[in-house]
Amino acid sequence: NLDIGLGSPTAIAFGANSHFPEPYRNALFILDWAYGKIFAVHLTPDGASYRGRFEEFVTGRPLNVTGADFGPDGALYFTTGGRRTQSGLYRVRFTGKPKEESGLPALGQTHLEAAKQSRELRRRLEVFHSEQSIEGLGLAWDNLSHDDFWIRHAARVALENQPIKRW
């Protein structure tokens, strides 16, 4: 759960294909039309989901951003326009030298593997949100008190979608 506040989100793009330094290659870029901002959201695995922290990446007035994508040159291209303002196409590229450290917490392999297993369990439970099954019923009951909120939620929804007479 990440609260950036009020705004008018218009688009997102992942930095995986960028030529930006490491923390930004793993970031999710979120465009806000109303406040003229592009946020970089840095995600870290947290159980069956992710946690995020954000920073302002590009800001301006007016900068009513409407869309974004990374080009084959690794630069971020974004467009602006709307409500009688001048439309535009902009390019953001990295020209410096990458830093040694990303500034993000280093996660151990054990933590990453545990988070991966949690996400796989959540996905297994989510199958039973639309499919009735004895296996799904047992899996849901087994995980109703799981430590992870998202797994508990998936288990509850899976249980709610199974016939009550099988409970």
Where are these regions (language model features)?
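Residue-level signal for short amphipathic helical patches enriched in basic/charged
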Residues: R84, H146-D147, Q162
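Amphipathic alpha-helical scaffolding segments comprising HEAT/armadillo-like alpha-solenoid repeats
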Residues: S102-L107, Q132-D142, Q162-W167
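Structural detector for internal amphipathic alpha-helices that build alpha-solenoid repeat scaffolds
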Residues: A115-Q132, D142, W150-N161
